[in-house]
C-alpha cells in the first residue's frame, strides 16, 4: 500500500488545506512549476529554435508518455486543448444528414459533450437512462456512441465492453471519455478496443488545465479523414503546400499551434503517476473511498456513489440537505471539495494517493457536523462554484 508521506511534500497545497477535489483539479506537483520555468527558459534563450528542439513534437511526444499510462501504442494519442475540441475533430470525420446520423449516449454524460452533439442540425441525439440501455439503443442508424468511462457526478464506472461489442456489430464508432478514470482506474485502451478515447490532464493525472488528449485506434486513424484540421495534420507541414495531404496515424487529427506551456505542466503530473503506478493508486483509492463510505454510514449520511468497488471510480458523492450551502461551509473549515446538482448529485470528495486517512476522517466528520447541527443554513443561497 502506498505511504502518502513519501509524496506529500511534492504537492505544496497539501500544507494549507484538506485537499479532496482531485476529481476536478488535482493538486499541482511542485515539478510542474519547475517545468514551466524550463518552458520560459527555452523561450527566452532559444527563441524560435525551441520549435525544432522539442516544442513542435510535443502534441505527439507528450501523448506517447500518456499512452504508457493508458495502455495505448506510440503515435495513437495526440494532445489538444480540451475534450470538446477533441470530440469535434472526431465528429468532423463524418458527413452529417445521411441515414446514419444518430448519436447515442447516457443522460448522465458530461454537459459539454452533450452540447456539442445537440448543436449539430444534421444529427439525431438519443439519450438513454443508464449504461445498460446504451447497447439496446444502438442500431444501424447510429453513427457515434460518446460515453463516459466514469460518470462525473457520482463516480460510477460504466460497463464499456458490451457497448463496444454492440457498436462494432452495428458499424458505429465508440468515443470513450476517460476524464474521470485516467490516473485512478487501471485500464488499457488497446484492450478495451474503443475506436476513440478522450480526456484531459486536470483531474487524477495531476497535469493541470489545457492538456486535453485524443486517442485514435491505429486502424481507425488510417481510414478516416477529419475536416477540422490544421497544418499540424499535414504530412509535410513545413513545405507549406496549398493542398492537404494527411499525416499518418493520429497526427492527422491535429490542428494548429500547440499549447506548449500546458504540455510542459502536464508532463510533471504524468511523471508522478507513472512513478507511483495506476494499480497502486487504485488500491489506495479504493481503501480511501471504502473508509469514506463506512464513515458516512456511521454518521447517517447518504452516499450516492456505488458501493461495489468494481463499479466505483475515485469519487464519493454524498447527498445533503443543501449541497451549495454545505460546500460553502466545508470551504470555511478548510476542506476543499465541490458539489454537483441532483439527480445523482451531492458533495463530491475525491481523495488521491497522497491524501491520508486522517484527512478522509476529518472531512466526513466535518460534513456530518455541518448537516447534524444545521450549520449549513447560514450559507444558504451560496452561489454554485466549480
What are these regions (language model features)?
Residues 1-386:
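Pyridoxal 5′-phosphate
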Amino acid at each position: 500500500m502506498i505511504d502518502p508521506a513519501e509524496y506529500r511534500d511534492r504537492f505544496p497545497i497539501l500544507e494549507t488545506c484538506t485537499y479532496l477535489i482531485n476529481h476536478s483539479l488535482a493538486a499541482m506537483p511542485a515539478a510542474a512549476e519547475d517545468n514551466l520555468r524550463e518552458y520560459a527558459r527555452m523561450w527566452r534563450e532559444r527563441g524560435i529554435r525551441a520549435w525544432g528542439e522539442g516544442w513542435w513534437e510535443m502534441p505527439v511526444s507528450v501523448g506517447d508518455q500518456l499512452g504508457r499510462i493508458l495502455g495505448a501504442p506510440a503515435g495513437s494519442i495526440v494532445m489538444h486543448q480540451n475534450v470538446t475540441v477533441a470530440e469535434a475533430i472526431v465528429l468532423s470525420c463524418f458527413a452529417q444528414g445521411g441515414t446514419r446520423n444518430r448519436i447515442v449516449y447516457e443522460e448522465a454524460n458530461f454537459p459539454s459533450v452533450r452540447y456539442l452533439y445537440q448543436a449539430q442540425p444534421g444529427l439525431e441525439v438519443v439519450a438513454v437512462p443508464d449504461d445498460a440501455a446504451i447497447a439496446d439503443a444502438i442500431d444501424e442508424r447510429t453513427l457515434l456512441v460518446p460515453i463516459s468511462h466514469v460518470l462525473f457526478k457520482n463516480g460510477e464506472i460504466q460497463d464499456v465492453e458490451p457497448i463496444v461489442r454492440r457498436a462494432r456489430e452495428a458499424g458505429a464508432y465508440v468515443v470513450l471519455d476517460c476524464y474521470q478514470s485516467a490516473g485512478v482506474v487501471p485500464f488499457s485502451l488497446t484492450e478495451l478496443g474503443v475506436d476513440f478515447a478522450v480526456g484531459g490532464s486536470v483531474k487524477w493525472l495531476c497535469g493541470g488545465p489545457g492538456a486535453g488528449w485524443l486517442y485514435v485506434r491505429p486502424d481507425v486513424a488510417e481510414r478516416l479523414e477529419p475536416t477540422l484540421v490544421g497544418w499540424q495534420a499535414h504530412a509535410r507541414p513545413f513545405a507549406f503546400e496549398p493542398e492537404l495531404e494527411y499525416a499518418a496515424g493520429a497526427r492527422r487529427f491535429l490542428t494548429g499551434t500547440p499549447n506548449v506551456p500546458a504540455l510542459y505542466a502536464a508532463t510533471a503530473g504524468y511523471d508522478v503517476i507513472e512513478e507511483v503506478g495506476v494499480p497502486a493508486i487504485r488500491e489506495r483509492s479504493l481503501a480511501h473511498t471504502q473508509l469514506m463510505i463506512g464513515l458516512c454510514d456511521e454518521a447517517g449520511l447518504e452516499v450516492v456513489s456505488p458501493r461495489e468497488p468494481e463499479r466505483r471510480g475515485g469519487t464519493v458523492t454524498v447527498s445533503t440537505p443543501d449541497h451549495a450551502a454545505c460546500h460553502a461551509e466545508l470551504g470555511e473549515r478548510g476542506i476543499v471539495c465541490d458539489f454537483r446538482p441532483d439527480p445523482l448529485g451531492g458533495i463530491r470528495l475525491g481523495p488521491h494517493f497522497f491524501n491520508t486517512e486522517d484527512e478522509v476522517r476529518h472531512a466526513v466528520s466535518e460534513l456530518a457536523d455541518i448537516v447534524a447541527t444545521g450549520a449549513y443554513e447560514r450559507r444558504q443561497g451560496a452561489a454554485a462554484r466549480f
